[in-house]
C-alpha cells in the first residue's frame, strides 16, 4: 500500500527495524522439568548433585521450578522430595491432575498446559527441560520452547540463554 501526500501516492518504504529479526524475548519466569525423562531415578541413579545445583541456581535467580509427569502424584512427589527436598518446586502436575487419567492426553501437552495455568504464565515465559530427544514433542504441542539437556550443563543462565535463543529463532 502506498503513502498519500499532497494528492499524490508514492510507494511506502519500510524502516530497517521493520526488516530486522527480533532480538529480544520475554523474561524466563519458569522452567518445567519432565520427571519421566529429565529427573534421575534415585533408586537406580542416586541423587543428582548437578540437578540440585541447577534447581538452586534457578531458585536463587527467581525462576520458578515446576515438574510434570505421566506417573501418579504420590510417586512423583516422593521422587522430587528425595532429589530436591521441600520448598524448591513451585508446582507438580501429574496424570492424576487430568480430568481423565489418560496417557495419550498427557502426551498431547496437557500436563504442560496445566502447569502453565497453575503458574499463571504463558508459554512465552517458560522453558521445558526433557531428558530425551523424543520427549521434546510433548512440550512443543503445548507451545513451549523445550531443550534436551544433560543436567550437568544446566543453570539459570543457560536456561535463560536457551529460552532467549529459541524465541529469537522462532521470530526469524
Where is each model-derived feature located?
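Asp-based, Mg2+/Mn2+-dependent phosphohydrolase catalytic module
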Residues: 1-37, 52, 56-59, 63, ...
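Conserved ATPase-coupling elements of RecA-like P-loop NTPase cores
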Residues: 41-47
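Conserved phosphate-coupling serine/threonine residues in phosphotransfer and NTP-handling enzymes
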Residues: 69-71
Amino acid at each position: 500500500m502506498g503513502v498519500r501526500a499532497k494528492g499524490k501516492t508514492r510507494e511506502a518504504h519500510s524502516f530497517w527495524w521493520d526488516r530486522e529479526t527480533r532480538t529480544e524475548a520475554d523474561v524466563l519466569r519458569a522452567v518445567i522439568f519432565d520427571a519421566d525423562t529429565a529427573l534421575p531415578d534415585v533408586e537406580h541413579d542416586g541423587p543428582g548433585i548437578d540437578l540440585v545445583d541447577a534447581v538452586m541456581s534457578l531458585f536463587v535467580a527467581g525462576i520458578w521450578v515446576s515438574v510434570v509427569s505421566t506417573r501418579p502424584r504420590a510417586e512423583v512427589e516422593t521422587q522430587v522430595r528425595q532429589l530436591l527436598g521441600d520448598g524448591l518446586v513451585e508446582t507438580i502436575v501429574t496424570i492424576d491432575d487430568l480430568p481423565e487419567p489418560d496417557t495419550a492426553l498427557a502426551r498431547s501437552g496437557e500436563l504442560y498446559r496445566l502447569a502453565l495455568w497453575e503458574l499463571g504464565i504463558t508459554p512465552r515465559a517458560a522453558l521445558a527441560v526433557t531428558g530425551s530427544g523424543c520427549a521434546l514433542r510433548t512440550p512443543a504441542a503445548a507451545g513451549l520452547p523445550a531443550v534436551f539437556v544433560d543436567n550437568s550443563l544446566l543453570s539459570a543462565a543457560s536456561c535463560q540463554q536457551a529460552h532467549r535463543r529459541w524465541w529469537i529463532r522462532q521470530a526469524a
